[in-house]
Amino acid sequence: MPRSLKKGPFVDDHLQAKVDVQNEKGTKQVIKTWSRRSTITPDFIGHTFAVHDGRKHVPVFVSENMVGHKLGEFAPTRTFKSHVKEDRKSKRR
């Protein structure tokens, strides 16, 4: 069930404060965050966030198409190691 419209989107206060400070100064530095649950709002457009994926921080540049999604959607937490095809040389005897 989606979030109620009367509540508005969830954004961690410390993250919103960092974006507001950068918008006032006119700077575009990378913002390091662990807040994967925060919703991307229109004032995030043009900023780069380093979103934590459990191991490292993945850079995410926010564009207009991302508004309404969560930051964590753009930093995958699982790495897929492809299924290794059998090595023909080791099978030969």
Swiss-Prot record:
Keyword Transcription regulation among UniProt keywords: no
GO MF term list: rRNA binding; structural constituent of ribosome
Gene3D superfamilies per UniProt: 30s Ribosomal Protein S19, Chain A
GO CC field: cytoplasm; small ribosomal subunit
Transmembrane portions of the chain: none
Keywords: Ribonucleoprotein, Ribosomal protein, RNA-binding, rRNA-binding
Pfam families hit by this protein: Ribosomal_S19
Tagged with keyword Transferase: no
Described purpose of this protein according to its UniProt entry: Protein S19 forms a complex with S13 that binds strongly to the 16S ribosomal RNA.
Family in the record: Belongs to the universal ribosomal protein uS19 family.
Protein name: Small ribosomal subunit protein uS19
